[in-house]
Amino acid sequence: MGLLDGKAAIVTGSARGIGRATAELFAGEGAKVLINDLDADVAEQAAGEIDGETAVHAGDLTKTGAADELVAAAVDAFGAVDIVVNNAGYTWDGVAHRMTDEQFQAMLDIHTVVPFRVARALAPHWREAAKAERNEGKEVFRKLINISSTSGTMGNAGQVNYSAAKAGVVGVTKTLAKEWGQFKINVNAVAFGFVETRLTAAKEAGGEMTSPSGEKIELGIPEQMRAMASAIIPLGRPATPAEASGPVLFLASPLANYMHGQILNVTGGMFGGMYT
């Protein structure tokens, strides 16, 4: 028996990194999982490699109507949605005095606006189901998990845009928890510290991605900063994506039915930003 047997989940940004590890873990615990990524080919490949029932919905979630299409795709594929993890995102770093409006807005769009829109798209499905269950004397929990960061809770030099956006999703989480608790919808967030993904790889390696607007963005952080980050983590190293996915599974499972409106810090003991 798996912790998520019979459940259907959406994990955004689930073709790589923490999202991919989360999708794999959910599937291993019995959930059906909708795989989402900006790159359709990468999403299809991930879905094919995950051992379990999956569906794919690729595309730019920042586009108008995309969140509604995402939820509709999951309902069409699985009949219902029980768990949603708002994980999709990327970084576009720069010091504040050189940051463009486009850079700043792009982070707000993917890290704050998209989770809000996904939640709004879920509302008619989850609220109406909960009302019917309440009338029947049933208590059924559904799970909304937003991914934040210590950049959002503590701030981080060179990431004023990302920090603002990840702080914003904390506000979204806490407000939805107050509004939706009556419907037995657990709303929580995970604030990660340093996790080894392509976003935190050495910048010297030359990693890059193309933003939804077509902009080429350098990924990673300088090797010197990576060394400093490891030095201030009491556990002595960054997390792996697999380690990061465990707390997300906890929040998605019945073990966390009475955990609500919380920001779970998963940092290896690091309480500040990655560097100051």
Identify the residue ranges that each predicted region occupies.
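Substrate-binding pocket helix/loop in short-chain dehydrogenase/reductase
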Residues: V95-A96, T100-L108, A229
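Short, small/polar-rich loop/turn modules that mediate ligand/substrate recognition or access, typified
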Residues: G181, N186, M259-G261
